[in-house]
Amino acid sequence: MKVLLIKDVKALGKAGEIKEVKDGYGQNFLIAKGFAKAATNEVLRKYESDKKKEAENLRFEIANLEKLKEELSKITLEISKPVGANGSLFGGVTKDEIAHALKEQSHIEIDKKSLECDTLKSLGIHEVSVKLGHAIHAKFNINIKAE
């Protein structure tokens, strides 16, 4: 019996593979537990069409992330913070503040967990990197000024 694996099965194969198994193992275990479907022509056609749709969605998502990367590379955020008598910042600029400033000034919403920087503790221009997903990284500048 041929089955299309829906989930990874230890010692048999990974999801998406077509395997030849004994009838009892296929019917009573793999199909019954939801690990596989019988590899009929209809199931295989549906699987292929779903795979094509998924690939198209992935291309669309990557194209959108590339556009976002391009937008971010042109941005310089302005953040004002109070400074002490010697010109050093009180505290610093955190990832949360950077994400909030990006949303307020550029209307781009980024999760603070995707920002790759430590707390910025000095005045001036700093470069911040962002993980957008699908191995796409973007960089933008932040200008920290004294209040």
UniProtKB/Swiss-Prot annotation:
Q: What is the protein name for this chain?
A: Large ribosomal subunit protein bL9
| Assigned protein family | Belongs to the bacterial ribosomal protein bL9 family.
Keywords, sorted A to Z: Ribonucleoprotein, Ribosomal protein, RNA-binding, rRNA-binding
- Show the GO MF annotations: rRNA binding; structural constituent of ribosome
PROSITE patterns, sorted: RIBOSOMAL_L9
Organism of origin is Campylobacter jejuni subsp. jejuni serotype O:2 (strain ATCC 700819 / NCTC 11168)
Example GO BP: translation
Q: Which domain of life is it from?
A: Bacteria
Q: What does this protein do?
A: Binds to the 23S rRNA.
GO cellular-component term (any): ribosome
InterPro entries this protein is in? Ribosomal_bL9, Ribosomal_bL9/RNase_H1_N, Ribosomal_bL9_bac/chp, Ribosomal_bL9_C, Ribosomal_bL9_C_sf, Ribosomal_bL9_N, Ribosomal_bL9_N_sf
Q: From which lineage does this chain's organism come?
A: Bacteria, Pseudomonadati, Campylobacterota, Epsilonproteobacteria, Campylobacterales
